[in-house]
Regions:
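Conserved SET/PR domain catalytic loop and adjacent active-site segment
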Residues: 21, 68-69, 89
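An N-terminal boundary/leader segment
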Residues: 1-55
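Generic hydrophobic alpha-helical segments
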Residues: 13-17, 60, 154
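Immediate post-signal peptide segment of exported/extracytoplasmic ligand-binding proteins
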Residues: 60-77
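Short glycine/serine-rich loop/turn segments
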Residues: 74-160
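Long amphipathic alpha-helix in the N-terminal Rossmann-like dinucleotide-binding domain
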Residues: 51-58, 114-118
Length: 160
């Protein structure tokens, strides 16, 4: 399967979806495979759910078919650092104290991305409360190293 995220820029992906040169499910499948491939070696993701991803892309496609309104991030997935609240996934802040906590709301920045067509792909690993302590995330280019602390999951998830 071709990695669409390496072939197209964000504006090109959006345009291809809106012209129907690409299908929303193509992006969903690329995302799911990318997360799976990265996760095997890096432990970059706290949580991501294949069914939620497919459902979000299906909803985005249905909405586009209904109203056809262009959005700057239509169908573009994004990972969320696990210190930002999301409706779909727990916000644990890298801490066992907050394990399983689901806030029931999105942080404003998440609402803004979703309002503009973005799709939540899941939550990426962070150090406890996003400070100092190392975690289990590994550098995808050298698994004997870590990408750091606070944004380690985000860094490992996008490294190529």
């Amino acid at each position: 399967m071709e990695n669409l995220f390496l072939k197209y820029s964000i504006p090109e992906l959006v345009k291809s979806l809106e012209k129907r040169d690409l299908l929303f499910i193509d992006i969903a499948n690329t995302l799911i495979k990318t997360i799976s491939d990265v996760e095997k070696n890096t432990h970059a993701w706290v949580c991501s759910d294949t069914d939620k991803i497919k459902n979000s892309f299906l909803q985005a496609e249905n909405e586009f078919n209904r109203n056809g309104v262009s959005q700057p991030l239509r169908g573009i997935p994004f990972g969320v650092k696990d210190i930002f609240n999301t409706k779909e996934y727990p916000t644990q802040m890298g801490s066992p104290t907050w394990e399983g906590f689901t806030p029931g709301n999105n942080a404003r920045v998440i609402d803004s991305l979703v309002f503009n067509g973005g799709i939540v792909a899941g939550k990426t690993v962070t150090a406890e409360f996003a400070v100092h302590a190392l975690n289990e995330t590994l550098n995808p280019h050298d698994v004997t190293r870590t990408p750091g602390t606070s944004s380690s999951g985000s860094a490992a998830a996008v490294a190529r």
